Amino acid sequence: MDSSDNKAATDEEIRRALKAADLMKILDGKMALGNKSGTKNLGEHKFWKTQPVPQITGSGASAPMEEGPIDDPKTPADVKQEPGVLPAGFEWSTIDINDEEQSKEVYVLLCENYVEDDDAMFRFNYSREFLLWALTAPGYLPDWHIGVRVQKTKKLVAFISGIKIDIRVRAKTFPAAEINFLCVHKKLRSKRLAPVLIKEVTRRVNLTNIWQAIYTAGVILPTPIGTCRYFHRNLNPPKLVDIGFSPLPRGSTIARLVQQYSVPSHPRIPGFREMKKEDVPQVGALLRRYLDRFDVAQAFKDDDEVEHWFLSGQGKEVGGRRVEQVVWAYVVEDPTTHRITDLISFYALPSTIMKHPKHNLLNAAYMFYYATDVIFPPPSSSAHSDADVNAGESSVAAVGTGGEDAKTKKKLETRLNALTADLLIIAKQAGFDVFNALTLLDNNMFLQEQKFGPGDGYLNYYLYNWNCAPIDGGQHSTTAKQGSKIGVVML
């Protein structure tokens, strides 16, 4: 082979690596407001200086403040009763996400504008089922699903959503809005609609006497409470190499990659099975107890929430991958006591592959919530009871994640690796190509051993009208196998 052949090979490797990086950015959510210029505009806009969020000082740190609300106390009577003013030619539209036509409009807007790469090679493929699952949690308010339309054509050109959640930040629990899917049509970025959308959803949330919110972004805004890093686990090497997601390493072969990322044919933990409705009370108690270990976490105050997030998206029919399935939730039932000892779950968010002669969809799974009782004191008796499941919450919460002794930490690491290994088998059998996870929860306990590779994206967590000390997102603790302090999974 002559020098020109070597150069061609090197150029091809560089091209494939850059293409893979583009897809990594999609999966990492780095371009989550459309193009890079639109994201930059939101981050630099003077709008944030007017909002009750911790401000970044000249040194790059936020100004010290006491933990708690930033704004002075208010009531809904203090809130403007009319919607904010839009630029000429646009109008507000409350979106009924249960209406098939309106949910399709949101789907099209998000797919074409929410996340994209520069070459238009990959796009998130939001399904109606995913949007229903994400936006209709118990207690949701249709008024918090806000669109902007062109007055003349009624075309939907912008969207933002909120759902009610109860959130705990260290010792304080309060109602909040989870804000998501802020999207402006890429041709209208110069209209500065994003700040107007944020103000409007804030106004509507405040009218319900809720004054705090949680949200995430791949860009730096004032001011992150914590940051997580994305990791990716290859499940389908031939396809990922073919579409440019995973360049073939020099000296390696597809066959070697297949062997490297192979998984067993069936789960290995005794009692590992799909979650059922009758599991909800036990799962809820176990999950709440587990999440008490983190500095920020969703409270999951009642079983309706648990049933929605882990069962409502299970799809139709039985066996294998179901029609319209969005979430996969599995538990471990003790064969002797019939206690639920573990929960683990993931959700699906595929990406459309544009302009590829063979493949049109990248099936991506994302780690969702999990919990295990191996870190808790054993129950007082072998008989199943809710009291046993709830026992010891305060003592574990006092220790906190990362505060367990070495023996308990090792038990947690071993159990999470076993649970994740079984979940990867389920994902592989369901036809997923890649499995994604952040460094939140205790994910660092298993990422390395389960062959997750680091992405180049980071997800920043934010609280609106709430100041708190920084919370560890685990992005620096992957090799140390140290859990994070973030216990909220944002879609």
UniProtKB/Swiss-Prot annotation:
Residue positions binding tetradecanoyl-CoA: H45, K46, F47, W48, L182, C183, V184, S190, K191, R192, L193, A194
InterPro entries (alphabetical): Acyl_CoA_acyltransferase, NMT, NMT_C, NMT_CS, NMT_N
Pfam families for the chain: NMT (PF01233), NMT_C (PF02799)
Catalytic reactions of this protein: N-terminal glycyl-[protein] + tetradecanoyl-CoA = N-tetradecanoylglycyl-[protein] + CoA + H(+)
GO molecular function list: glycylpeptide N-tetradecanoyltransferase activity
Gene Ontology CC terms: cytosol
Subcellular locations according to the entry: Cytoplasm
EC number from the UniProt entry: 2.3.1.97
Domain of life: Eukaryota
Annotated stretches, region: Disordered: 53-79
EC primary class: transferase
Family annotation (SUPFAM superfamilies): Acyl-CoA N-acyltransferases (Nat) (SSF55729)
Main localization category: cytoplasm
Keywords: Acyltransferase, Cytoplasm, Transferase
Catalytic residues, chain numbering: L491
Protein family (similarity comment): Belongs to the NMT family.
Subunit and partners: Monomer.
Stated role: Adds a myristoyl group to the N-terminal glycine residue of certain cellular proteins.
Name of the protein in question: Glycylpeptide N-tetradecanoyltransferase
